[in-house]
């Protein structure tokens, strides 16, 4: 493989990693430092979806943004539906950082927020 083919993927990974770190940092600020109101819940959900998108870009930098957005949407919807089982809440009670990845309770509004955030990122 030539160097010129590796460089764009490498650059895309570096950019995705930096943006992912920034997104996770913002998410933690929203989660820990701001009041727990609807606006921060919406912001946190949007940042979660964006973080998932960036993580997929980090793993697969050659995929098209639309395909990456689709994978991120499937993950976000799957995690939200998984919350209907009560397992994420139980895991979060034992290991609280898991709540940041798995959430706790199902909220249909979250599904809309994930999809809107991903549509904006992909556009």
Predicted segments with their positions:
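Bulky hydrophobic segments
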Residues: 1-123
